[in-house]
């Protein structure tokens, strides 16, 4: 269960929120793996306040080179040095707003895995694509092309986030989400075999709230969540975490 804070919170606000979540995780004894993804400037300070709790520090993006003339970018080795163990790649906002392609995402995935980071690979269709009936084609292409030349997926998580449900208040029904998650797992089975697919965790993201989390997480192929807006409130985020059992 990962909270993606996106471009929200100052360093001080991030530390306060992380502290509140860490205290709740420690007190509640949660059964699932929990991560939070603050902004880049807050990573190091947040790391200090969660390192005792078992919460994973996640980054929201990375570059596919280790160093160099890439103004405004952050490399995987810098993220690792800041305490990150996960990085979110291919989020729909990166694809839609910043023009990231499957090929670019693939370069980042390979770099992050090579540097020892775990990767949350985001996939999902737009409203237009869903209405045209090509959801399966779009999502499986994002999976296949995002994983070109990746031979080991033991440190991979895939997050299905229908673009039309992110930040809109709309949520895929549990049946819609399960259908796509099953497609993803079937494609991974085809690419990497049944054992790897069975061990793969597939998250759902897209307006997950305390009120709908339990029914989503009850689906057989939904293994967790990538939570946006609700993760900015410690109580709401923990209610979702607890819904995952």
From Swiss-Prot:
Disulfide bonds: none annotated. Substrate binds at residues 4-6, 167, 207, 228-229. It comes from Chlorobaculum tepidum (strain ATCC 49652 / DSM 12025 / NBRC 103806 / TLS). It catalyses: D-glyceraldehyde 3-phosphate = dihydroxyacetone phosphate. The active site is at 91 (electrophile), 161 (proton acceptor). GO terms for biological process: gluconeogenesis; glyceraldehyde-3-phosphate biosynthetic process; glycerol catabolic process; glycolytic process. Pfam families: TIM. GO terms for cellular component: cytosol. The gene is tpiA. Pathway: Carbohydrate biosynthesis; gluconeogenesis; Carbohydrate degradation; glycolysis; D-glyceraldehyde 3-phosphate from glycerone phosphate: step 1/1. It is an enzyme of class 5 (isomerase). It is found in: Cytoplasm. InterPro entries: Aldolase_TIM, TIM_sf, TrioseP_Isoase_bac/euk, Triosephosphate_isomerase, Triosephosphate_isomerase_AS. One of its GO terms (molecular function) is triose-phosphate isomerase activity. Belongs to the triosephosphate isomerase family. Transmembrane segments: none annotated. Involved in the gluconeogenesis. Catalyzes stereospecifically the conversion of dihydroxyacetone phosphate (DHAP) to D-glyceraldehyde-3-phosphate (G3P). This is Triosephosphate isomerase. Homodimer.
